[in-house]
């Protein structure tokens, strides 16, 4: 059975299971709920945010972009700690495994400070903390809500979340070499 067929079946099973158990959120609960980024963690697109999922939430998500497919299993472990397991299929020019590289990784996201009226929420996290190191990166991010519909995030990242010629990681993580797929 192909990877995409397994992914489609998993999605249908999860949808059917959640359809019966899902309960609508009240408007006040929805305003402070985090969205999931392409890595299955709280954030927008590929950038983390200093928000958390509701306590006890389990999420399954998948993304496809530029030939890469990621399947994410996210869970709110404790009130301030989010974790995610990821399995990814990445196009590889080396020809390994029918032209694809298969990667797995584990992330965590810790909300250190909750948002106050005049102070942002602050979170620390590590992407691909346990795994091959392909997506490895660490970050500290602050998020502040402006009104009920707008959130602004800013932060500092290392590893995959940093630019070229940036300074060394102060935590000492991320010394693993990335892979070149070209």
Positions of PLM-derived features:
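Cleavable N-terminal export/targeting peptides
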Residues: 1-37
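Transmembrane beta-barrel domains of Gram-negative outer membranes and organellar outer membranes
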Residues: 25-137, 143-150, 154, 158-163, ...
């Amino acid at each position: 059975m192909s990877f995409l067929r397994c992914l489609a079946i998993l999605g249908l099973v999860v949808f059917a299971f959640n359809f019966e158990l899902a309960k609508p959120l009240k408007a006040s609960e929805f305003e402070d709920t985090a969205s999931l980024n392409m890595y299955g963690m709280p954030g927008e697109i590929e950038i983390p945010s200093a928000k958390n999922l509701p306590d006890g939430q389990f999420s399954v998500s998948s993304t496809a972009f530029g030939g890469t497919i990621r399947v994410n299993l996210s869970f709110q472990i404790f009130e301030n700690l989010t974790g995610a397991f990821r399995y990814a299929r990445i196009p590889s020019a080396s020809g390994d495994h029918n032209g694809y590289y298969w990667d797995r990784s584990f992330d965590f996201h810790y909300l250190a400070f909750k948002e106050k009226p005049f102070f942002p929420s602050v979170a620390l996290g590590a992407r691909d903390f346990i795994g091959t190191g392909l997506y490895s990166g660490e970050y500290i991010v602050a998020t502040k809500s402006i009104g009920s519909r707008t959130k602004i995030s800013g932060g500092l990242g290392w590893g995959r979340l940093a630019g070229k010629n940036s300074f060394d990681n102060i935590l000492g993580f991320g010394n693993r070499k990335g892979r070149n797929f070209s």
